């Protein structure tokens, strides 16, 4: 391959994808597939008695991300390289990631994920690109000879940012992009002078500052120190990445006014949006530009992807923390805000409500999404429904002011990892029927449609699914000690644990089914294996209690011989990309049951679809577009619509007690949270979950994610699934049609839309002579 690492000396437009997370997964197998060498390497190793899959298992999952945000970033990098575009991913080289999850006595316990303990072969340290990052101190203003004010940050602490490049190999095209993850080092390792004075903390202060910056992803921010560390992390990698980008630009170009022609900074969610003010700072203070010049450049270089509909997830910083840690950056944000508020008041006189909603600085907070929208030349949502809700609801005021900025880019996934690598049996079957072009053009799988009713193709598909279920069942036996039946329905929900994703509704339904079987042992019921996988944020009490509930329900049900194994419940510990590939391949039912209007897009739904699982979901996020692609007969939709949910929220007319008091099955299940059934008679263990469903909590309404409202519709949809699965031919037809209609959901399509509409990139010209 050519070690192009973003085209090396090529004077093409670069895209810097800034993200707090990159959930890459293991690199060896994926790189071999993209190099077209997997089969040859596998055969060569077998000749000397080695198993490539065993070798792959020795590689740790890089602990650089947690959930869908990070996995999307990884898919995008794969697609950028495969499509031949120059790109850097920009993030942090976390030493311990978020955490490694252990389940002890049913509870989640967080331990460090020491993925770097044995080194990592797929990274290259680049000390020649070292930059100073400053925190704290104060700003001194001086009048220069040119008569203009000059600003200098003094009395600060600083660290050095040093990048590690991880290669992102394009499929079959000799292009290698780079994931540039930043490590922090102290400017001074150890202060002997401070140590000799007995000030031992001061002696290692620089070292501690650097180490803390890159220890963990998303440190707990339930306290001031945690908030400070998160903000420092964000500024650290953003500042370093911009400094690197400008150095690279100036190596090839003389005029920084041309920066927008050659560089785009895509801000993945609100975490990197301090990039707006940092780019301004460098242009103003280090390059000597006027405000108008710097603003013109910045507002044509930065673009923002919004990933959430929920207002509480739009990042805000207390002004006092922001100002103390980033004094010069804060001054610039303050000036951006002052000018923007003037615009608002000029356009909407006597409308302070507009100012309240749209100002960057308001009520003691720095609103990072507002900063990104004001400065960004593009603001995109990640599914059509999500973007519509942003435009009509959450960001309506901004959309009215800047309609030209808003656009939709429905998320996608890379078929190379999640089919070619993750499910080789199915990948070979697809290739046998439609050729291998699907690997770089997923739309080609539409040709599978004609095989959906073919009995031979159906039987082949079902046998492949069975083999993948056997593989996962073996893993579950080895890691969980639970025997599961590969002939049962594998019903799967694997994703970040959050109340709006409604893992609680799923496990309540399992409890409901268990009650039904206990009361009616002879009832017609197709055996189910319910598989969960999720990490809860360390400080998220309700989410962690949900994990405990899932595990205690599993203990009760799995050890009850009276139900003859009709239900099994499994919680996959430390859910991560490498095991996710096996889970997607084995799933029959894909649970995508978020409260309508809350999930921006989702990408797990697409991975299941690509692997021939049938979706059980709400009309939320990308489920809506999946429904349109695959048709109503091949997906199980239930529950309230986004409009209905939003209407209830606006009118405050939903009372979960109305359902609780009028549905005895629901009442029984909810009461079991506090009657000791699943808690060894500890009636308080799940009281918090019980209260969240029925009693308003800390200013929040009861059952804010409408679990009880949707429960009966969910149970009915599950019942239909049980009946439908018994018709293996019909099930296989629907599963094959799901694969056939997954073409839209390739990240290749998504990235090409970003390129065409936002980034305007040119493809890398690769000279393959001698390769």
Identify the function of each model-found stretch.
Residues 2-7, 12:
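Single conserved hydrophobic/aromatic residue that forms the stacking wall/gate
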Residues 53-64, 217-232, 256-268, 276-285, ...:
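Glycine- and acidic
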Residues 61, 84, 98, 239-319:
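An amphipathic, hydrophobic-aromatic interaction surface with interspersed Lys/Arg
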Residues 91-92, 99-104, 108-123, 290-335, ...:
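Catalytic or ion-translocation cores adjacent to nucleophile or general acid/base/metal-coordination motifs
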Residues 123-268, 317, 321-382, 394-496, ...:
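Active-site cores of enzymes that catalyze phosphoryl transfer or operate on phosphate-rich substrates
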Residues 242, 269-280, 293, 297-298, ...:
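Extended, hydrophobic alpha-helical segments in both membrane/secreted and soluble proteins
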Residues 302, 309, 466-580, 768-769:
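Long, K/E/R/D-enriched contiguous segments that form extended
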Residues 397-447, 585-586, 593-735, 739-744, ...:
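Catalytic binding pocket for nucleotide-activated donors in carbohydrate/polymer assembly enzymes
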